């Protein structure tokens, strides 16, 4: 049989993107409407109802908004109060439409943490629509992408949020999605690369991003395939020279790097932790420093120290 309105309100709460505009209602009044499915005909709050309202407002860090007129608040503050209203409704299912809209990063993280804890600790089923793929991967147990108004697929974040799947889902012909960082990357610069970056341990990433912003195509290497630099370089670099992790660099890989750097007029290198397995990094770097036809630029903490011409 169908639920009555009161019964349905005890089962499901909804937080929509559209903003309500109630006149002369305070933040507390808005949150308290979440308790009306539990009140009598006159809508009078019991002590238990008041406690639930106050707990919900504390949970979303909105107690200081209780006495202020709802229409006078910012969009982010309104969003927190509407979430508090849904929380004190004590539903079995919570549906949220773009709940992170209008929120700065601090409250966005707090909101997602609250939703995650509600699902885990209270057994509430949380259904939310998001355009932020990175957040969907971090918070969701299941991801259901929608395309052209239809469910495109359904599965775990690991199954759905893959590079090629996202490319097909959004019909992307430029740029790429990185499932490791959960980030969207702009297209790599076009043209013949005359710049090379020698780095390791994630220290080349700031250089990659600056070169991309300046529209300078570049070669990255030698990079171990399990290095953070490698993960981003495969999206941004024109060419990546890679080596297998936890092994000495093979002669063929080293010669490929020598050949690549010989055609570059500018070489960036970063702080690299030296060890026995990557000693050929240093060998390659020393060869570059000995050249007079190339500029070798050291990168550390944003500082540049130039060598050569």
Descriptions of predicted regions:
Residues 109-122:
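Helical segment within the ABC ATPase nucleotide-binding domain
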Residues 32, 47-66:
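Conserved ABC ATPase "signature" region
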Residues 171-249, 269-270, 276-279, 297-309:
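ABC ATPase nucleotide-binding domains
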Residues 90:
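Conserved catalytic motifs of ABC-family nucleotide-binding domains
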Residues 148-149:
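Conserved ABC ATPase "signature" C-loop
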Residues 43-44, 69-73, 77:
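Conserved ABC ATPase signature
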Residues 94-98:
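Catalytic Walker B motif of ABC-type/P-loop ATPase nucleotide-binding domains
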